[in-house]
Amino acid sequence: LLSRRQRQMCIRDRDTYRTQIQLLSMLDPEVASDIVVSHQLFAEQSGGSFPRWVMANIETGVMQGDPTPILIANAYAFGARNYDPKPIFKIMRKGAEEPGSKSQDVETRPGLKQYLDKGYYNASIQLEYTSADFAIGQFALHAVGDEFASWRYFHFARSWKNLYNPDTGWLQSRNPDGSWKSLGEDFRESTYKNYFWMVPYDIAGLVEIIGGKEKA
């Protein structure tokens, strides 16, 4: 896959999926495509699922969420397309729907079974998962041409609404039985106020659920 191309590793996916991969994909789509294929190869050689933070060819498990599908979907959207999207989409789906999927010894999505079965989990992790699911849906639709799969992942992405507590007006973690955890619990490297806006694909839905523009 990388004959006469460069393997790109030591990519901090969670720190680069928001802006860096988009810029790189516009400026040098071949290098960005190599990054995508390098992630594919790493997954295929390391348990079948994508990593999220690789250092010296080791999946460290640092940070949370499932950032690689977001990175890849953004690379595709911004012009890095020199690869076959179908096997990449297959890897995305494995991590998103098969509890226990791993990259090396690191579980791709901790808490995935509860997330899929109940539609809620720890708040900041779930908000990362829903962003990843929206990205997978976009990749399914535009790169693979699978409209049915895209709507499946868009449905998962909308589960952020299950975190909204109308009594407090904030997004909160929930226990397995559906009860609310303490406001601010389970937010990593941030606060519940910062993470409140972590639905960039559905800002209109967030504004609506809190009561309109005046509330926002």
Predicted regions and their residues:
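Active-site cavity-forming subdomains of large catalytic enzyme subunits
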Residues: 43-160, 166, 189-190
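Short alpha-helical scaffolding segments that buttress acidic/His motifs in well-ordered protein cores
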Residues: 36-39, 92, 157, 203
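Glycine-rich phosphate/pyrophosphate-binding loops
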Residues: 27-50
